[in-house]
UniProtKB/Swiss-Prot annotation:
InterPro entries: Aldolase_TIM, PdxS/SNZ, PdxS/SNZ_N, RibuloseP-bd_barrel. This is Pyridoxal 5'-phosphate synthase subunit PdxS. Induction: By indole. Its EC number is 4.3.3.6. The keyword GTP-binding does not apply. Pathway: Cofactor biosynthesis; pyridoxal 5'-phosphate biosynthesis. Catalyzes the formation of pyridoxal 5'-phosphate from ribose 5-phosphate (RBP), glyceraldehyde 3-phosphate (G3P) and ammonia. The ammonia is provided by the PdxT subunit. Can also use ribulose 5-phosphate and dihydroxyacetone phosphate as substrates, resulting from enzyme-catalyzed isomerization of RBP and G3P, respectively. The keyword Transcription regulation does not apply. It catalyses: aldehydo-D-ribose 5-phosphate + D-glyceraldehyde 3-phosphate + L-glutamine = pyridoxal 5'-phosphate + L-glutamate + phosphate + 3 H2O + H(+). D-ribose 5-phosphate binds at D47, G176, G237, G258, S259. One of its GO terms (biological process) is pyridoxine biosynthetic process. In the presence of PdxT, forms a dodecamer of heterodimers. Belongs to the PdxS/SNZ family.
Length: 317
């Protein structure tokens, strides 16, 4: 697999009555990838750094785990260049659990993505939590058989990542802070952008497509359906059962939890509580019950106290 070479997006020629064999193959692949992501809907995906943590997450009811060497809070506090995790660590986690395993690649680092695919992970997260490898290009995700997860702070970012082949979108939030406010803001922004599209006529949608730097057919589809064509999760700052219920009530189809579980006082109990809250998110009595006796939550940091150059959500374009 190489970086060079042209690979057309299946979005090309959507309106044509003649579909090439290549386009048919891409559309079939897209359905498979998005279908795999759709199976995680309603679930909680947890960051883990050891096979033992992965088993705790699985026992708590996690729908998938994210294998990495350092959780975002440690990446933030320790600094340095954050890269793809060691293959031995990833394989150890893959072999430890029966649920899907995700792993992170740096933005634009297509070779890290190739390695992760060779290791047999179930999803690749092209993640702003790691140090970007390319400040101009994201990975061409159509070249891979494994589905990709990508972050977004607004609809334009989400549409561009989908155009590149992402099968799942997550809000970026501000990872490693324990402050859910940015995740909430990004989710509201994406929903607000979609609502604005729905009020536009066809001519105005052409202008919107230019504004979002996304294909017109994709913009028109979102305007028609009122939602993204892929599953939308929330990530960044979810640390309590109430946080999980909050974003689920706001329309998130699932939750990523990074540092919030294994940086807390009782990881096993908190993991199970967040899973239950994400499932029964519209029942306040359940949220109250599962929030009892969990021990200390991660200390965290207010997003407003994070200097602009250190805000991970601003990585990507």
């Amino acid at each position: 697999m190489t970086e060079s070479g042209s690979t057309a997006s299946p979005l090309c020629g959507v309106g044509s009555s003649v579909m090439t064999e290549t386009q048919e193959t891409y559309q079939a692949t897209t359905r498979v990838k998005r279908g795999l992501a759709d199976m995680l809907k309603g679930g909680v995906i947890m960051d883990v750094v050891t096979p033992e943590q992965a088993r705790i997450a699985e026992d708590a009811g996690a729908s998938a785990v994210m294998a990495l060497e350092r959780v975002p809070a440690d990446i933030r506090s320790q600094g340095g260049v954050a890269r793809m995790s060691d293959p031995d660590l990833i394989e150890g986690i893959v072999n430890a659990v029966s649920i899907p395993v995700m792993a992170k690649a740096r933005i634009g680092h297509f070779v890290e993505a190739q390695v992760l695919e060779a290791l047999g992970v179930d999803f690749i997260d092209e993640s702003e939590v790691l140090s970007p490898a390319d400040y101009t290009h994201h990975i061409n995700k159509w070249k891979f058989d494994v589905p990709f997860v990508c972050g977004a702070t607004n609809l334009g970012e989400a549409l561009r990542r989908i155009t590149e082949g992402a099968a799942m979108i997550r809000s970026k939030g501000e990872a490693g802070t324990g402050d859910v406010s940015e995740a909430v803001r990004h989710l509201r922004t994406i929903r607000g952008d979609i609502n604005r599209l729905r009020s536009l006529d066809e001519d105005e949608l052409f202008v919107a497509a230019k504004e979002f730097q996304a294909p017109y057919d994709l913009v028109r589809e979102v305007a028609s359906t009122g939602k993204l064509p892929v599953v939308t999760f929330v990530a960044g700052g979810v640390a309590t059962p109430a946080d999980a219920a909050l974003v689920r009530q706001m329309g998130a189809e699932g939750v990523f939890v990074g540092s919030g579980i294994f940086k807390s006082g009782n990881p096993a109990a908190r993991a199970a509580a967040i899973v239950k809250a994400a499932t029964l998110f519209d029942d306040p009595s359940v949220i109250a019950d599962v929030s009892r006796g969990l021990g200390e939550a991660m200390v965290g940091i207010n997003v407003s106290d994070v200097p602009a150059p250190h805000r991970l959500a601003e990585r990507g374009w």
